């Protein structure tokens, strides 16, 4: 063995002791690799790297459960995989639509700040070494000069540190603005905001995706760029500086480099083996946050009904249940982070520090440029100060490099969390795009078979079971349905093959029992529901106006309520003035609210200020303002008095508006010319309306109902009299015979 060391030392010009130390390092490294590799290999193959089970965290509640028939697809859990990089590249096209953008400018400034901070760190490390050298050499003048330099360099260093954080926040805000703008454009295009909730079931909480998910994704991307770019640059530059310094002093950097590579590799393997599925956990946490917010908003939207029913206990239990599910998920993430961070800190703080001391000591001890065995006291003292300077500089550089590697490895957890946010944001844009193109899918939950613990969400593409084969054609005059069925988003056929035509000047009365498809027909005519079969000829949307039973009151002034959804500029472009709006309010008997509420510019919460009848008359005022060719009236005057209601309908007919009305009031029949009647079993009939005959039949129906209403009471009294008298009655005998048969 000694002969081998001597031969090796002679060949590479090493001393015998240096060759022995290098051989010892290589043997130790080989032994550590031989010992750790099988352990890590077994650890990676253990079932500990399983997918999260159902008992790990309870599944989030679904907003709706639909029947699943044939085609079912499973969503993969978000993680660091090919899907993540594909989704990130697709989102990059939104973040950077072209080369020269605001986001590119902030990114370049951020990169310059990160690079500047790296060079400042290297300069400060060298300056620290020179300060320590001046202390060892007892040179106060040199020490003061170096200290002043150190304080002066602190000014740009602190500015760069602050600028890095500032630019990171600006970059995150720019990303968020870009994503929000694109999301809003897509969300409000082609009535996607309606269809994504009522026609599609993949996004349970679009508000969560549009707000918090986009915010978290933007912050995570910007922070991760900062946490990866600077550390990678730090590792490259500090490694180059350390190797150059060691080589200039006559020391070999091979041993420390191999040791560093081995330690980093082993640490990465251990952390990867111990890392929980943060991407899946964070995505589930975001889902539960969104559902909790949805439950809160649901209570706010129905607060009056809940108060009337005194249902606060039920709603409180529902809220507590949702919050406990969220708290359970957050506690699960915290507990997994606790052990992961403990292992991470032990490896990166203590194991790396010990290895760092070895890596710094070996080049200094073995460097020929620091040998002082045969020197006098003066030169020996100089060598001591040089070694001190080199040790201080190398230690600072190594600490900077170790911190950079630590941040790179710690970023794995952040990357997995980013994968969760990326999956949710990408899925939101994907769903918006498909819904915009008329592709609808319903999310369903399949109960696990044989007590299976699978949590996978299942989806049924509705477009595969109900292909949209119908055609919608915009025409200038008339509404024509040719074999158009009424099919709900859940796939239920309410009415099949509607065939009718409404010309201008015709007024159609639509009747039928509840749930027969009256309002559903209006949704098809308005373009909210697709036409699955047949051909629908209808005017463009601007020539049709829908008025529901409960009109929507927007945020804004009284003027904004009348002209909704137009803006004030749109009103002026159409040639309207406030005096014209006053005439409209006179037509619907609503002008008194102008003085009562403080004029046209008064801003209030109009859904609470106006009564039910006033809100319905406001809806009719909007119809007179927009002057459509066709008005779709869905019980829109049920809270208005009959006399005022008749005047409004007469004014609408006088304005040349064709009415398609859903109403149960016989007093309005005289304002219609045709009848579309649904029977509630899928059948329908379309005919000309004879108001006189229909009113006569209605009066006869009401008379018979009133006469027959007393028969059960009379029959009961007859039975009582027969029992008291002990006699039978002919009617009682007939009834008994019927019951027996």
UniProtKB/Swiss-Prot annotation:
Main subcellular localisation: membrane
TM regions (residue ranges): 107-127, 144-164, 251-271, 351-371
Location of the protein in the cell: Peroxisome membrane
Entry comment describing in which tissues the protein is expressed: Expressed in brain and testis.
Membrane topology designation: Multi-pass membrane protein
Listed GO CC annotations: peroxisomal membrane; peroxisome
ATP-binding recorded as keyword: yes
Listed EC numbers: 3.1.2.-, 7.6.2.-
Keyword Nucleotide-binding in annotation: yes
Catalytic activity: a very long-chain fatty acyl-CoA + H2O = a very long-chain fatty acid + CoA + H(+); a very long-chain fatty acid(in) + ATP + H2O = a very long-chain fatty acid(out) + ADP + phosphate + H(+)
Region: Interaction with PEX19, residue numbers: 1-218
Entry-linked SMART domains: AAA
Ranges of residues in domain ABC transporter: 479-705
Residue positions with a glycan: 190, 227
SUPFAM superfamilies: ABC transporter transmembrane region, P-loop containing nucleoside triphosphate hydrolases
GO biological process: alpha-linolenic acid metabolic process; fatty acid beta-oxidation; fatty acid derivative biosynthetic process; linoleic acid metabolic process; long-chain fatty acid biosynthetic process; long-chain fatty acid import into peroxisome; myelin maintenance; negative regulation of cytokine production involved in inflammatory response
Domain ABC transmembrane type-1: 107-399
Main function: ATP-dependent transporter of the ATP-binding cassette (ABC) family involved in the transport of very long chain fatty acid (VLCFA)-CoA from the cytosol to the peroxisome lumen. Like ABCD1 seems to have fatty acyl-CoA thioesterase (ACOT) and ATPase activities, according to this model, VLCFA-CoA as free VLCFA is transpoted in an ATP-dependent manner into peroxisomes after the hydrolysis of VLCFA-CoA mediated by the ACOT activity of ABCD2.
Family recorded in the similarity comment: Belongs to the ABC transporter superfamily. ABCD family. Peroxisomal fatty acyl CoA transporter (TC 3.A.1.203) subfamily.
UniProt subunit comment: Homodimers. Homotetramers. The minimal functional unit is a homodimer but the major oligomeric form in peroxisomal membrane is a homotetramer. Forms heterotetramers with ABCD1. Forms heterodimers with ABCD1. Forms heterodimers with ABCD3. In addition to tetramers, some larger molecular assemblies are also found but represented only a minor fraction. Interacts with PEX19; facilitates ABCD2 insertion into the peroxisome membrane.
Name this protein carries in UniProt: ATP-binding cassette sub-family D member 2
Species this protein is from: Rattus norvegicus (Rat)
């Amino acid at each position: 063995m000694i002969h081998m060391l001597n031969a090796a030392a002679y060949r590479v010009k090493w001393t015998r002791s240096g060759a022995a130390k290098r051989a010892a390092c290589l043997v130790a490294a080989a032994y550590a690799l031989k010992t750790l590799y099988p352990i890590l290999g077994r650890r990676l193959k253990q079932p500990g790297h399983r997918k999260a089970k159902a008992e790990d965290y309870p599944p989030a509640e679904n907003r709706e459960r639909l029947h699943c028939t044939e085609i079912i697809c499973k969503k993969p859990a978000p993680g660091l995989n090919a899907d993540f990089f594909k989704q990130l590249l697709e989102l990059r096209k939104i973040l950077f639509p072209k080369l020269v953008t605001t986001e590119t400018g902030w990114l370049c400034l951020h990169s310059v700040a990160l690079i500047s901070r790296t060079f400042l760190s290297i300069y400060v490390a060298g300056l620290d070494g020179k300060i320590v050298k001046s202390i060892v050499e007892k040179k106060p003048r040199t020490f003061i000069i170096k200290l002043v330099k150190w304080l002066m360099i602190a000014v740009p260093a602190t500015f760069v540190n602050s600028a890095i954080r500032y630019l990171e926040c600006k970059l995150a805000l720019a990303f968020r603005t870009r994503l929000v703008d694109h999301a809003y454009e897509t969300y409000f295009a082609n009535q996607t905001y309606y269809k994504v909730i009522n026609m599609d079931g993949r996004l349970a909480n679009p508000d969560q995706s549009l707000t918090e998910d986009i915010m978290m994704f933007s912050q995570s991307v910007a922070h991760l760029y900062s946490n990866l770019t600077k550390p990678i640059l730090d590792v490259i530059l500090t490694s180059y500086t350390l190797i150059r310094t060691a080589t200039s002093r006559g020391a070999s950097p091979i041993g420390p480099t191999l040791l560093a590579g081995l330690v980093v590799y082993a640490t990465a393997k251990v952390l990867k083996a111990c890392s929980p599925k943060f991407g899946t956990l964070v995505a589930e946490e975001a889902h539960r946050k969104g559902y909790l917010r949805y439950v809160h908003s649901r209570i706010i939207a129905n607060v009056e009904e809940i108060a009337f029913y005194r249902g606060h206990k039920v709603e409180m239990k529902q809220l507590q249940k949702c919050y406990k599910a969220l708290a359970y998920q957050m506690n699960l993430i915290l507990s997994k982070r606790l052990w992961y961070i403990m292992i991470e800190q032990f490896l990166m703080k203590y194991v790396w520090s010990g290895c760092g001391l070895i890596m710094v000591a070996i080049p200094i001890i073995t460097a020929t440029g620091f040998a002082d065995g045969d020197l006098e006291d003066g030169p020996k003292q100089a060598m001591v100060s040089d070694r001190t300077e080199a040790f201080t500089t190398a230690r600072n550089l190594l600490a900077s490099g170790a911190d950079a590697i630590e941040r790179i490895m710690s970023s794995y957890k952040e990357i997995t969390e980013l994968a969760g946010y990326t999956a949710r944001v990408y899925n939101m844009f994907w769903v918006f795009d498909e819904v915009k193109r008329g592709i609808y899918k319903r999310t369903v939950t399949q109960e696990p078979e044989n007590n299976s613990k699978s949590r996978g969400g299942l989806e049924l593409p509705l477009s595969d079971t109900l292909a949209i084969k119908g055609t919608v054609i915009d025409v200038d005059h008339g509404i024509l349905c040719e074999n158009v069925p009424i099919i709900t988003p859940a796939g239920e056929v309410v009415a099949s093959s509607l065939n009718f035509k409404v010309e201008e000047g015709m007024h159609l009365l639509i009747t039928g029992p509840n749930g027969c498809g009256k309002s559903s027909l209006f949704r098809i005519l308005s373009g909210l529901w697709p036409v699955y079969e047949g051909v629908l000829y209808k005017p463009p949307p601007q020539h049709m106006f829908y008025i529901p039973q409960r009109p929507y009151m927007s945020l804004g002034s009284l003027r904004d309520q009348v002209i909704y959804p137009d803006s004030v500029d749109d009103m002026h472009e159409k040639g309207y003035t406030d005096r014209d709006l006053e005439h409209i309010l006179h037509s619907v008997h609503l002008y008194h609210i102008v003085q009562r509420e403080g004029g046209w510019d008064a801003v209030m919460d109009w859904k609470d200020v106006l009564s039910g009848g006033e809100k319905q008359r406001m809806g009719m005022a909007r119809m007179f303002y927009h002057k459509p060719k066709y008005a779709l009236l869905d019980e829109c005057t049920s809270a208005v008095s009959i006399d005022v209601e008749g005047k409004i309908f007469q004014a609408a007919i006088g304005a040349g508006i064709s009415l398609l009305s859903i109403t149960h009031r016989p007093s309005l029949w005289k304002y219609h010319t045709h009848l579309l009647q649904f029977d509630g079993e899928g059948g329908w009939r379309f005919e000309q309306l004879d108001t006189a005959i229909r009113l006569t039949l209605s009066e006869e129906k009401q008379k018979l109902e009133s006469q027959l209403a007393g028969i059960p009471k009379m029959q009961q009294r007859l039975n009582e009299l027969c029992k008291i008298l002990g006699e039978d009655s002919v009617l009682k005998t007939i009834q008994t015979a019927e019951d027996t048969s």
